[in-house]
């Protein structure tokens, strides 16, 4: 008898469940979560036999930048680890193109578990885009929580009104050094993942279709997409497990 028959079926099920986005490492973790222990070498072998492979990572897109300036210090200093929720947030804006039209995504990520806690989609990168995103994020704070919010030096974050919104809300502003994308590497990495696992895989006819897919993907990313760093749990699963 084929000793890997049920394991092979599970690998295939997980692969299709996640629309081909998982490579052998995440499939191994997902199998473990279902009580099936396989090493990476075995998972790769089974995937090869099944003729499946993870979708290729496409090179990282450079996010939308404004004029360079000097507004505040880099308080994060590439320390992307947070010991509790709502301690360190990061944000940025990225751009998508569909048939000559543009769509902008502005999210806030919590570095505690990599969860996208708030985001806004807009066809123009206006101040209201980041304001709406910030307002939604603030609703999740208890009165004692005062996160650092880190960004690059994009024009949105240099606006005096953005600084005022943060100050009035008790949020501590932090900014990357000039021209240094590694200072905000985690949110840049999220954009790369989103684009390679969603945007680049489809040919969109209009902005509305893309918008719908991004909303679906962010929900998937938060609720279902497991991470080795989080012990094989998704961001939301990890947060709930730590709070229990």
Task: Name each model-derived stretch.
Residues 1-84, 180, 236-242:
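Basic, flexible linker segments flanking DNA-binding modules
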Residues 2, 65-67, 151-153, 159-162, ...:
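RNase H-like two-metal-ion nuclease catalytic core shared by retroviral integrases
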Residues 3, 7, 23, 39, ...:
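Hydrophobic (often cysteine-bearing) scaffold residues that line and stabilize catalytic clefts
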Residues 11, 27, 43, 47, ...:
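Mobile genetic element proteins and their domesticated derivatives, centered on retroelements
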Residues 78, 82-117, 123-127:
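An active-site-proximal beta-strand-loop segment
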Residues 113-119, 173-176, 200-201:
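Short small-residue beta-strand/loop micro-motif enriched in glycine and branched aliphatics
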Residues 120-143:
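Active-site beta-loop-alpha junctions of metal-dependent nucleic acid enzymes
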Residues 167-171, 193-244:
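C-terminal domain-tail junction helix/linker
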């Amino acid at each position: 008898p084929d000793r890997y028959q049920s394991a092979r079926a599970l690998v295939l099920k997980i692969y299709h469940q996640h629309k081909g986005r998982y490579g052998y490492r995440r499939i191994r973790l997902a199998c473990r979560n279902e009580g099936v222990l396989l090493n990476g070498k075995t998972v790769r072998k089974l995937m090869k036999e099944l003729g499946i492979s993870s979708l290729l990572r496409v090179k990282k897109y450079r996010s939308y930048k404004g004029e360079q300036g000097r507004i505040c210090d880099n308080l994060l200093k590439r320390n992307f680890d947070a010991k509790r929720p709502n301690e360190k947030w990061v944000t940025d804006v990225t751009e998508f193109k569909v048939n000559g039209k543009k769509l902008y995504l502005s999210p806030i990520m919590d570095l505690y578990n990599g969860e996208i806690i708030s985001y806004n989609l807009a066809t123009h990168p206006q101040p209201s885009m980041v304001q709406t995103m910030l307002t939604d994020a603030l609703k999740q704070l208890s009165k004692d929580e005062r996160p650092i919010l880190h960004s690059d030096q994009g024009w949105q974050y240099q606006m005096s009104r953005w600084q005022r919104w943060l100050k009035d809300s008790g949020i501590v502003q932090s900014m990357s050094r000039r021209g240094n994308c590694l200072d905000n590497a985690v949110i840049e990495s999220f954009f790369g993942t989103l684009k390679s696992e969603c945007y680049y895989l489809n040919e969109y006819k209009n902005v509305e279709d893309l918008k719908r897919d991004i909303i679906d993907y962010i929900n998937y990313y938060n609720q279902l997409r497991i991470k080795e760093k989080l012990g094989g749990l998704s961001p939301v699963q990890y947060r709930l497990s730590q709070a229990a």
